[in-house]
Structures are given as C-alpha cells and as structure tokens.
Amino acid sequence: MGLKKACLTVLCLIVFCFGIFYTFDRVNQGERNAVSLLKEKLFNEEGEPVNLIFCYTILQMKVAERIMAQHPGERFYVVLMSENRNEKYDYYFNQIKDKAERAYFFHLPYGLNKSFNFIPTMAELKVKSMLLPKVKRIYLASLEKVSIAAFLSTYPDAEIKTFDDGTGNLIQSSSYLGDEFSVNGTIKRNFARMMIGDWSIAKTRNASDEHYTIFKGLKNIMDDGRRKMTYLPLFDASELKTGDETGGTVRILLGSPDKEMKEISEKAAKNFKIQYVAPHPRQTYGLSGVTTLNSPYVIEDYILREIKKNPHTRYEIYTFFSGAALTMKDFPNVHVYALKPASLPEDYWLKPVYALFTQSGIPILTFDDKN
C-alpha cells in the first residue's frame, strides 16, 4: 500500500510538472484547468458536496441537463469526454455549462485507448478526481468507459445513478452488461489497475440504485429489479400547435457516423426521393444528391423548431438504426421510417434494432441497395 501511494505521489508531480493540468489551456478554453480545483481542495473542502455527471455524447448531455433540472440548488460538475468537437458538441456543452457549477470538456481526438494518450489522460483524470470536494452522487451512462472508473474508485461511497445511452440500453447484447473494462495492452491494463483498483463494469452496474430511461414502454437492460427505474422524457412536443398536412412534405435522412454507410445512404436517398440529410454529430463525410442540414441542433430539437414554424408541413424521417427514430415517432406531423437494405443478412447485428422499431410501430422499408 505504501508503494502504491508513493507511485501515485510521483505521478501527481509528473502531471503538474508537464502541464497536463492545462494551466494555460487554449485549445479547451480553460475547461481543463485544475487550478480552481486545487484552490477549492485546499481552502474550501468543507463546502457542500457535489454531484458529478459524465457525458460522452450529445444525447447524454441532453439527459444530464434534465437530471440537473430535477435537483435545483445542488452543485453539479459536468465532465464531457469525446473524440469529436464540432458546432453541435460546442453548442450543447455550452448549454449545460451555463447550468453547472463547473464543466470540463476532455477532447480526445485520437481516442483514449491510443498508447500515447491513455496513460497521461488516465493520470490526469485520477489526480483531478482526488482534487474534487466531497462527492455525493455520480451520474453516468457509459458504464463500459474505464475513464469514469478513475472517479468511481476514488469515491466508492458516492451514490451511483445511471441513465440511457440510446438504443444500447434496449439491446441484450449491450456492452453495458459486460463484467470487465476492455483495455488493450499489458502496460495500459496494469496502469489502469493502478488507477482504478478492482473497479469493473459489473461493480458500477450493481452499485446503481436508480436508472433514468428516455424510452417509455420498452424493456431496458437495467430494469432487473435491483434499482428504481425513472422515466425522463427528453423532448416535449405537447404544446406544439399543428394542423392538417397541407403544406408539402419534407423528407430527411438521418446520417450515420460510419463511412461505409455513404454509398447505401446515397442510394436510399435516391430511392425514396429524400431531399435532406441531417448529419450524425460524429459524421465527417457528406452525401451527394441531397442537401445537408447544417445546424447546431440535434435532429429532435431541429424538427421541433421546424414544426413550430411550419405547422402544416408533413415531415418524413428516414433512418437505418438511429435511436432518434424512437424519440421522434410521436411528434405531431412527423412520420418515421426505418430503412433496411435488401442485402442485409438475417443475422446482422442490427436485427435487434429493427425488432425494436417494429415493436414501437415504426414501419420497416426494404430497398434494393445493389442497383
């Protein structure tokens, strides 16, 4: 134990000396500056405990914002970790940043598991976890992320609350049902163990005493009788005033972050006479033959605004496997369709997603993607 503490002390010194604390952080606009954390740890440790919320996607930030709204007056620190940084991520991060006491954006352009990135980032996370004031609750969706375990292992007595990360919470083959973190390489695995001890995915899952779900009426993998399940609707269309669909039809394809979907997406757009594509927040490629909707909003927020402006327009939303199909299917004047390429084998991994769509009343449209 003494050796472990000594190693951790040396690690802290290295982190300070080499500037991993981003004291003069320009790329992240000071969001990873630890000086304020250090000051609070030294001079205000007896203050009110804080709640931590970890996010990896825009959807998770939306859920986190709703959770925070349910606890007015409490202190919240938000930690966003992402390989992506674009207009959408910045917009929603700034939204939640305005509502949190502190917010940190860890932009990891090469991914955490890259050898040159893993050790310094895990070191930074562990040291910063120890600089936090007393932690009351920890909220997270991505149970499989070893980076969050750096904080969980530092505060084993904190309450753990989990929330949905899209359709991954509705599929039995989800990585959230695993036991151990996936860390490639012996050196990285050993370093991870030094940072998180015996913490695991299973330990996080079993410690969760409440789970927030955004999907009503669908079986959730976290609904196993061990915890309270709380429904948390994300998008409210109840106050929209709409009329008959006499204002024309707007067809929108939901983009995919996977580049191999480019050709199939273009064929689908042509086949169904789709005019627009709403890029996925992590999408880096464009599609020919359709107009790209450039907006800082995720598709649900975008459509709600469009319905308000054009209450007589019919909106047709086409998707291959986006969870947004489930969150938008009950919007007024919105008709959602799931696309299934004819070449897709019966045992393809998307089969459970299509089953979800069918269960939710979303039509499945098969098309010839080879011609």
Swiss-Prot record:
What happens when you mutate residue 129 to A? In strain: 126E / NRCC 4010
Cite the effect that the entry attributes to residue 273 to N: In strain: 406Y / NRCC 4030 and 126E / NRCC 4010
Protein name per Swiss-Prot or TrEMBL:
N-acetyllactosaminide alpha-2,3-sialyltransferase
**A GO biological process this protein is involved in?**
lipopolysaccharide biosynthetic process
Q: Which Pfam families match?
A: Glyco_transf_52
**Subunit details:** Homodimer.
Consequence of changing residue 280 to A: Decreases the rate of sialic acid transfer
> Is the Transferase keyword given for this protein?
yes
Task: Extract the InterPro entries matched here.
Answer: Glyco_transf_52
**One term of GO molecular function:** N-acetyllactosaminide alpha-2,3-sialyltransferase activity
Effect of altering residue 29 to H?
In strain: 406Y / NRCC 4030 and NRCC 4725
Q: Where in the cell is it found?
A: Cell outer membrane
Reaction equations catalysed: a beta-D-galactosyl-(1->4)-N-acetyl-beta-D-glucosaminyl derivative + CMP-N-acetyl-beta-neuraminate = an N-acetyl-alpha-neuraminyl-(2->3)-beta-D-galactosyl-(1->4)-N-acetyl-beta-D-glucosaminyl derivative + CMP + H(+)
Main localization is membrane
Q: In which pathway does it act?
A: Bacterial outer membrane biogenesis; lipooligosaccharide biosynthesis
A GO term from the CC aspect: cell outer membrane
- State the active site: 258 (proton acceptor), 280 (proton donor)
Noted pH dependence of activity: Optimum pH is 6.0.
**Organism, as annotated:** Neisseria meningitidis serogroup B (strain ATCC BAA-335 / MC58)
Keywords from UniProt, A to Z, are:
Cell outer membrane, Glycosyltransferase, Lipopolysaccharide biosynthesis, Membrane, Transferase
For CMP-N-acetyl-beta-neuraminate, which residues are the binding ones? Answer: 255, 278-282, 299-300, 322-323
Q: E.C. number, please?
A: 2.4.3.6
Q: What does this protein do?
A: Catalyzes the transfer of sialic acid from the substrate CMP-N-acetylneuraminate to the terminal galactose residue of the lacto-N-neotetraose branch of surface lipooligosaccharide (LOS), forming an alpha-2,3-sialyl linkage. Thus, functions in the sialylation of LOS, which plays a role in the evasion of the host immune response by protecting N.meningitidis from complement-mediated serum killing and from phagocytic killing by neutrophils.
Membrane topology note = Peripheral membrane protein
Entry's family note: Belongs to the glycosyltransferase 52 family.
